[in-house]
Swiss-Prot record:
SUPFAM superfamilies membership: WD40 repeat-like
Compositional bias of kind Basic residues: 1-10
Protein name from the UniProt record: Uncharacterized WD repeat-containing protein F47D12.9
UniProt xrefs under PANTHER family: DDB1 AND CUL4 ASSOCIATED FACTOR 4, DDB1- AND CUL4-ASSOCIATED FACTOR 4-RELATED
Length: 545
């Protein structure tokens, strides 16, 4: 026996009187060993029992305190999945990263984070510490207001046209000061007169006493129990009053309500826009269409462009000059006129025709034609200096034409901007960029220096081959569009995110809703709201932090 095997064999021998090194023999198979003390299984403590929700109060999850994991409650208990708080945070970050990766971005690479609601204290701290500028603080405040937009209107105002039944709104705009609303409404007289369209100018005022009384009434209503609250018509916390501006000259014996309307049209309205002819006078450009039967029995279509002054939006000192021929003109065109636009620097009017584009000078009465690639000019707009015109064509891209050239006016196009029904230049913020909207239900921001791809895309809009209402605020921070599905949506022109989506009542008439936005309604800064003209009412959605 080797020395190693001998040491291993005697390792279990008892060594003298010391039994500490002695090891008991191993238990053999099927040998019974009597236990000296019974084994007791300790019960789990009450604080270690799993319970629903956990510290995060997550519905649908069970929380285990010992493992610190969340288990999703399912109908099949054999397939549980445990998630810790770090797992949930990681999943949320992955979801947010995927969402940010799929968002449209600027082609230059610069990108601003998705707007979220920020308290005033956080914004002021960032401003004090120099982490943001004052312009960004203002933008965050307005975006937070839009993010808090309630789908239900704060209150509803019946369109103040007492002697007619209003069918819908065809045009709506607001002044920069927020104290005037210009609208074209389709009205049905109560008498024997036929259905027609009328232009009205409303005065918007904000009354302080109404603000205090309505705010107190809303606070008392919110203190009531939910079951005790009755249906109310809303709370006019902005103190808004909308009244028509009467045109009573004092010489007519007829009632003043007959002169409510600025003008009336018995023909179909194709397009309308406001034209600031000079610093004192504001006019309205309107395109109407009607059909006539010739002597041979053929149906012939004619379009007429009307230029009419709006005394309510003009300077009171310019009243004696409103009857001047330069402010009251009309042009009759055989064929279709799809769009009309005003070029203020050159005092000219643009007509989007069936197969070309026409420019009419208001001072010299001279006109010339420009190529539109033999396409219908669905919409157009002029640049801030008046030298360029951007045209949205049917079945073709948006083109840019230079008015200073004698021939070959087309100098550029946007690849992918097809069937564009709305074109607008961002004159105040980005004069080199245009915003387009078309039949593909996508609102895009383009730069003609990089015409192959848009700078930004805003999704969620709905358009089914209609010319819909698109509105910009005076600071060009937001864009609002009424969709063919009855929703009015708003996007941020800085980040491209949708900030609000409001569903309007579904009416049987084919007139789509119109929406305007202002942050100084009634001439009071801070009165921020969206007004939607739907049917015979104006739905006011007040925006609060």
């Amino acid at each position: 026996m080797s020395r190693y095997r001998f040491r291993k064999a005697r390792s279990n021998w008892p060594m003298g009187q010391n039994d500490s090194r002695w090891e008991p023999p191993p238990v053999r198979l099927n040998e019974l060993v009597t236990a000296t003390e019974p084994e007791e299984i300790p019960l789990p403590k009450l604080e270690d029992q799993p319970y629903e929700g956990g510290p995060l109060n997550m519905t649908g999850f069970m929380y285990h305190p010992r493992t610190k994991k969340y288990y999703k409650m399912t109908q099949d208990p054999t397939m549980p999945q445990g998630f810790s708080k770090s797992d949930l945070d990681r999943m949320e970050k992955a979801r947010e990263a995927k969402f940010q990766a799929n968002r449209p971005r600027f082609t230059s690479g610069s990108f601003i984070q998705r707007p979220v609601f920020k308290p005033i204290t956080t914004l002021m701290d960032d401003l004090t510490l120099g982490r943001c500028t004052m312009a960004r603080v203002e933008r965050h405040i307005h975006e937070s207001r839009l993010l808090n937009c309630n789908p239900k209107p704060s209150f509803t105002i019946k369109t103040p046209i007492e002697h007619y039944d209003v069918s819908g709104c065809e045009f709506l705009d607001v002044s920069e000061t927020g104290d005037r609303i210009v609208g074209t409404f389709t009205v049905n007289p109560n008498g024997v007169a036929a259905k027609h369209s009328a232009v009205y100018v409303f005065e918007v005022d904000s009354i302080g006493d109404t603000i205090q009384s309505e705010s107190s009434r809303r606070e008392a209503y919110q203190l009531l129990p939910i079951r005790s609250r009755s249906n109310n018509a809303g709370f006019n916390t902005l103190g808004l009053t909308v009244r028509p501006m009467l045109r009573d000259d004092g010489f007519s014996d007829e009632p003043s309500y007959l002169d409510y309307a600025v003008t009336r049209y018995n023909s179909f309205i194709v397009d309308q826009t406001l034209a600031r002819v000079d610093a004192d006078v504001t006019c309205m450009l309107t395109v109407t269409a009607n059909d006539t039967i010739t002597r041979n029995g053929n149906v012939c279509s004619y379009c007429t462009v009307h230029l009419e002054p709006l005394a309510e939006l003009s300077d009171p000192e310019a009243m004696p000059t409103l009857n001047s021929p330069i402010y009251n003109k009309s042009w009759r065109e055989k064929g279709n006129i799809w769009s009309v636009g005003w070029n203020a620097p050159q005092m000219s009017i643009g007509f989007g025709l069936e197969s070309c584009f026409r420019v009419e000078n208001l001072l010299t009465d001279r006109s010339f034609l420009m190529s539109s690639r033999k396409r219908n000019v669905l919409n157009h707009c002029f640049s801030a200096d008046g030298n360029l015109v951007y045209m949205g064509l049917r079945n073709d891209n948006v083109i840019k034409s230079d008015l200073r050239m004698n021939r070959d006016h087309i100098t550029g196009q946007l690849n992918g901007a097809c069937n564009t029904t709305f074109v607008r230049v961002l004159e105040k913020t980005r004069p080199e960029c245009v915003v387009t909207e078309g039949f593909d239900s996508i609102i895009r921001i383009w730069d003609f220096r990089w015409p192959k791809n848009p700078m930004m895309e805003m999704h969620g809009h709905s358009n089914n081959c209609n010319r819909l209402n698109v509105f910009f605020d005076k600071e060009e921070r937001f864009v609002f569009a009424a969709g063919s599905d009855g929703y009015v949506r708003g996007w941020s022109l800085t980040s491209g995110d949708m900030l609000c989506s409001v569903k309007t009542p579904n009416h049987s008439n084919p007139i789509f809703p119109r929406a305007v936005y202002s942050d100084c309604w009634g001439g009071r800064p801070g009165n921020s709201a969206i007004i939607m003209a739907v049917g015979d009412s104006m739905r006011v959605h007040s925006l609060e932090l």
